[in-house]
């Protein structure tokens, strides 16, 4: 029997190194014929600009991270050019190793106590009116990082009293009640937690996560804060059926969720889960209509939609595709 890999604290494991650490072995993209992108998935990326460099410089200066960079989001250039970014707190190393995600896995460094203040000042310097805060999973922390989320919300509002905050949280596995209690006095304006895919695909795509647990997290937060909208997102193209997605939408509505994002999964590398199919825009349109019929007040559905893509516009109900 081979010895388990001894991970060094603070070292990022990515691509093949990360996939090698996943107990549930999946067929990686490198062993399959890679699907060619259809025309609707081909876009011209905006050129590099001073605005993009300014945002990156502000991040580096304060030792902050964006999920845009860490997860290799295809919308990075567009969002940075518009002066928006999704900040990723609690470091850039995740304790989970989901094979669809490009965020590094490993043993995280200790939480930086000054991060909330640095984050608040950076947001003030950028003159943002709407901000999305997300994080890596921190299963190494007793509260899963919940108190740090609360501290960030508090510090951001102290320096930016008119800002709107959306938090995209992990599942706080095994510590949900503790986490919700720690965050109750500093809730966001929108509470987001992504289900990512249909429950049948959890073992393959979200090892370590639990579909029902995630639904309960969304429901319990809503019960605690009935006036704060809850939101969730799903990827298409991992092997799910349209019928399975509709059932997930029904589950979300049954648990009080009113905001939805649906987007096309793109494999970050040949080592990640392969794209099983490219979902045509017309199918996203159909699912949006179904979502609205089910009672979602906001539904951003389209190939390039991501959970925090134009989140400020999503919150206003402006159509996003």
UniProtKB/Swiss-Prot annotation:
Its main location: cytoplasm. Keywords: 4Fe-4S, Cytoplasm, Iron, Iron-sulfur, Metal-binding, S-adenosyl-L-methionine, Transferase. It is an enzyme of class 2 (transferase). One of its GO terms (molecular function) is metal ion binding. Its EC number is 2.8.1.8. SUPFAM superfamilies: Radical SAM enzymes. GO terms for cellular component: cytoplasm. Pathway: Protein modification; protein lipoylation via endogenous pathway; protein N(6)-(lipoyl)lysine from octanoyl-[acyl-carrier-protein]: step 2/2. CDD domains: Radical_SAM. [4Fe-4S] cluster 2 binds at residues 94, 98, 101. It catalyses: [[Fe-S] cluster scaffold protein carrying a second [4Fe-4S](2+) cluster] + N(6)-octanoyl-L-lysyl-[protein] + 2 oxidized [2Fe-2S]-[ferredoxin] + 2 S-adenosyl-L-methionine + 4 H(+) = [[Fe-S] cluster scaffold protein] + N(6)-[(R)-dihydrolipoyl]-L-lysyl-[protein] + 4 Fe(3+) + 2 hydrogen sulfide + 2 5'-deoxyadenosine + 2 L-methionine + 2 reduced [2Fe-2S]-[ferredoxin]. It holds the Pfam family Radical_SAM. [4Fe-4S] cluster 1 binds at residues 68, 73, 79, 308. Binds 2 [4Fe-4S] clusters per subunit. One cluster is coordinated with 3 cysteines and an exchangeable S-adenosyl-L-methionine. It is found in: Cytoplasm. Its cofactor is [4Fe-4S] cluster. InterPro entries: Aldolase_TIM (IPR013785), Elp3/MiaA/NifB-like_rSAM (IPR006638), LIAS_N (IPR031691), Lipoyl_synth (IPR003698), rSAM (IPR007197). The keyword S-adenosyl-L-methionine applies. It comes from the Bacteria. Residues 80-297 form the Radical SAM core domain. HAMAP family: Lipoyl_synth (MF_00206). This is Lipoyl synthase. It comes from Vibrio campbellii (strain ATCC BAA-1116). The gene is lipA.
């Amino acid at each position: 029997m081979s010895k388990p890999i001894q991970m060094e604290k603070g070292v990022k494991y990515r691509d093949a190194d990360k996939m090698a650490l996943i107990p549930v072995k999946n067929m990686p993209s490198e062993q399959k014929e890679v699907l060619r992108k259809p025309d609707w998935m081909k876009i011209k990326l905006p050129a590099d600009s001073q605005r993009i460099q300014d945002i990156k410089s502000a991040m580096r200066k304060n030792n902050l991270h964006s999920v845009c960079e860490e997860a290799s989001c295809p919308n990075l250039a567009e969002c940075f050019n518009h002066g928006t970014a999704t900040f990723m707190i609690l470091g850039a190393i995740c304790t989970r190793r989901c094979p669809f995600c490009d965020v590094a896995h490993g043993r995280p460094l200790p939480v930086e106590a000054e991060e909330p203040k640095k984050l608040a000042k950076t947001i003030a310097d950028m003159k943002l009116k709407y901000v999305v805060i997300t994080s890596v999973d921190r299963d190494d922390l007793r509260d899963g990082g919940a108190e740090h989320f609360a501290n960030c919300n508090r510090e951001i509002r102290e320096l930016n009293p008119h800002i709107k905050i959306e938090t995209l949280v992990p599942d706080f596995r095994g510590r949900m009640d503790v986490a919700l209690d720690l965050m109750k006095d500093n809730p966001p304006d929108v509470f987001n937690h992504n289900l990512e895919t249909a429950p049948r695909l959890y073992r393959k795509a979200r090892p370590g996560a639990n579909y029902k647990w995630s639904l309960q997290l969304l429901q319990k937060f809503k019960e605690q804060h009935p006036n704060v909208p809850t939101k969730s997102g799903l990827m298409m193209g991992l092997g799910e059926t349209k019928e399975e997605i509709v059932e997930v939408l029904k589950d979300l509505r049954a648990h009080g969720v009113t905001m939805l994002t649906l987007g096309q999964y793109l494999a970050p590398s040949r080592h990640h889960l392969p794209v099983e199919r490219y979902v045509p825009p017309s199918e996203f349109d159909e699912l949006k209509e179904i979502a609205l019929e089910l009672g979602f007040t906001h539904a951003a559905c389209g190939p390039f939609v991501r959970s925090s893509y134009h989140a400020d516009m999503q919150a206003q109900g402006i159509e996003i595709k």
